[in-house]
Swiss-Prot record:
The gene is hemC. PROSITE patterns: PORPHOBILINOGEN_DEAM (PS00533). Pathway: Porphyrin-containing compound metabolism; protoporphyrin-IX biosynthesis; coproporphyrinogen-III from 5-aminolevulinate: step 2/4. It catalyses: 4 porphobilinogen + H2O = hydroxymethylbilane + 4 NH4(+). It is an enzyme of class 2 (transferase). Monomer. This is Porphobilinogen deaminase. The keyword Cell division does not apply. It comes from Ruthia magnifica subsp. Calyptogena magnifica. HAMAP family: Porphobil_deam (MF_00260). The keyword Protein biosynthesis does not apply. The porphobilinogen subunits are added to the dipyrromethane group. It holds the Pfam family Porphobil_deamC. Tetrapolymerization of the monopyrrole PBG into the hydroxymethylbilane pre-uroporphyrinogen in several discrete steps. Its cofactor is dipyrromethane.
Amino acid sequence: MNKTLKIATRQSPLALWQAQNVKIRLEKHHPDLTVILVEMTTKGDQILNSPLSKIGGKGLFIKELEVSMMKGITDIAVHSMKDVPYEIPQGFKLGAILKRENPFDAFVSNDFSSIDDLPQNAKVGTCSIRRIVQLKAIRPDLKILDLRGNVNTRLKKLDKGGFDGIILACAGLIRLGFESRIKQQISDQQSLPAVGQGVVGIEIRENDTEILDLIKPLIDVETTYMVSAERAMNARLEGGCSVPIAGFALIDNEQIMLTGLVGNVDTGVILKEQILSHVSQAEALGVELANKLISLGAKDILKN
């Protein structure tokens, strides 16, 4: 008997690519399964003239998708994990974390080959406070301008002029076939990635064991540990998108190394710590790192 599964997705090209990728993989694992994409416009997609931090944060990109699952219109939602708030609403859970792709930030420009190559007082576009605080640390002279919209929209804005360069996520550019636009992959030393960057996650209804069984083959265990550590740190710090928090985990030989950062965009103060543990302690590691940052004054920065 054929089964049908409906995926809730945003309408942006990147969101559709990610949902389509999940559809292809699910249908490959389950030949009797038909997967349908249900496209939706979210509040985050509609309000483009204000920074995310001022209009309610990245949760604006997923609320409508969760409502559709709650009503039974759709069965799962596919998200970029860096857009998923650390608190998942009651009645939902993350059912699968997929294998991490390129987690780094990208410098994109039509005229300059790297951030170092930019002239004094160059104009750089980004809407991420995390990127702004780290960019200012390496190039305090730069003029940072707000840049909203999906990947295609941001590239068009760059091409029209007004920016000497823009900062985007490598993963999004690569997924959409824009890898050639990347002039510089920015190292994690210069720009520590966002929590969950480069990772796609699948959200499901909390007690939906049938759906959980269907998506299980897509789970990547190593990435799940990494994202668990990063999100545990973020949750302990109570970090939304209005504060500059970065968290990035790496795994080598069952050891997980987590680097965390909290910054103050006004004063330029940056707190950065790194700790190591066994992968089985991923979540506890995230909490421990957050506590270290708190002991250095992270909460004072986040309050402001």
